[in-house]
Amino acid sequence: YDLGMMKYSTMIWTSDNTHPGPRIKIQYGSMLAYPAATMSCHVSRPATLADLDYRFHVALGGALGYELHLPNASEAVKARIREQVREYRKYEDLILRGDYYPLMNPFTDVGSAYYFTDPERSRFLLTFLQTGGNAFHTFKLCIAEADPQMVYYDAIGGETYSGAQLRAGIPVTGSADTQYSRMWYFVKV
């Protein structure tokens, strides 16, 4: 992954490693220097539908792709992939052209958390990816760019929050499952 490659392609693989644990760290480090639009982030080799969802949430750190042999996939997996692609399209411009704010460092924390926002600060895609211990520990994920005077609707969870609440932090409780993820899509009302 180097700048010289950007002369020939605007998007490249950050790594051949698509396993979620290492991939979260790879994407975190890459995002400190490169925009998300340069990263090709793929879902591959899911063992279960829950694993497919977790890998999808990890791959939302950049340009989404799939590395699967679809003729061998079950109808449930194919249906879930169609849903995931539709969901990705809702956030694609925010991920590829928005501003990125890391909240948790996967090298020192039990996972990764970050958000993307648009220049107007009217939309926020917040992602939490747990990779290890501290099951049931509650974290506060603060969206410092939210306008404290505005109200935001979470289009995924269906709840409404004030900008002041987003700035103070959204509580998220970890899980005993080391591959636990959670997303929020806040839209200014």
Regions found by a protein language model. Name each.
Residues A144-G158:
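Solvent-exposed beta-hairpin/edge-strand motifs
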Residues Y1-N72:
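Glycan-recognition surfaces
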Residues H57, F124, R182:
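Residue-level detector of short, conserved catalytic/binding motifs and their immediate flanks
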Residues L70-N72, T127-Q130, I156, K188:
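Active-site proximal loops enriched in glycine and acidic residues that flank catalytic Cys/His/Asp
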Residues G163-V189:
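C-terminal beta-strand-rich structural cap/linker in extracellular carbohydrate-active enzymes
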Residues A59, L126, D154:
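Conserved, mostly hydrophobic/aromatic
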Residues P106-D147:
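Carbohydrate-binding surface patches
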